[in-house]
Amino acid sequence: IPELNDEVQATKGFNVIATANNRDRGVNELSSALKRRFNTVILPVPETADEEVEIVQTRVASLGRALELPAEAPAIEEIRRVVTIFRELRDGKTADGKTKLKSPSGTLSPAEAISVMNSGLALAAHFGDGILRANDIASGLVGAVIKDPVQDKVVWQEYLETVVKERKDWKDVYRAAREVL
């Protein structure tokens, strides 16, 4: 510890666990010497939307209980909509494959979907009536998608206008997301 002019030895069994997303790059790559000192495990994005929805639903329920959020568990349809948005933007096309989309610079991982849902639940619980609605998740969605305020904002606006606006049951998501912008 240079600041204390001291040295501390790790106890037996000490491990460092680091995480990163494939699309998140720092200024410099890790050196090959450092990479050799890590066991690397790559977790792929879930193959199906149903699998991803199940992961998000399970974690959101678990975290909601741990955080003692008084909000109702989110309707599966709200989770499905967030997962659909993330998958379509990640994949660069709509779920039906009919519309090609630009992808934002962020990863839009299941972990981010979990974060969007938990944030929405907290807003619904503490500032709403406890029922998760599109306006509760809109700011989280926008924050997850728009990492680069120039490039990603264009991607998100195009997605809203060409995909979300046209979906019959998604008018509330469209309105809420437009209000946040």
Question: Language-model segments: which ranges?
Answer:
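C-terminal engagement/docking regions of AAA+ P-loop ATPases
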Residues: 125-181
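Signal for well-folded cores of large energy- and translation-related assemblies
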Residues: 24-27, 35, 39, 87-90, ...
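Residues that form generic nucleotide/phosphate-binding pockets
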Residues: 37, 55, 59, 81, ...
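Conserved AAA+ ATPase small/helical "lid" subdomain
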Residues: 53, 60-136
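Generic alpha-helix detector with strongest preference for long hydrophobic helices that associate
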Residues: 11, 15, 19, 36-37, ...
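Canonical AAA+ ATPase core
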Residues: 1-67, 121-123
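Acidic-enriched, low-complexity/disordered segments with a strong bias for Aspartate over Glutamate
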Residues: 6, 24, 50, 91, ...
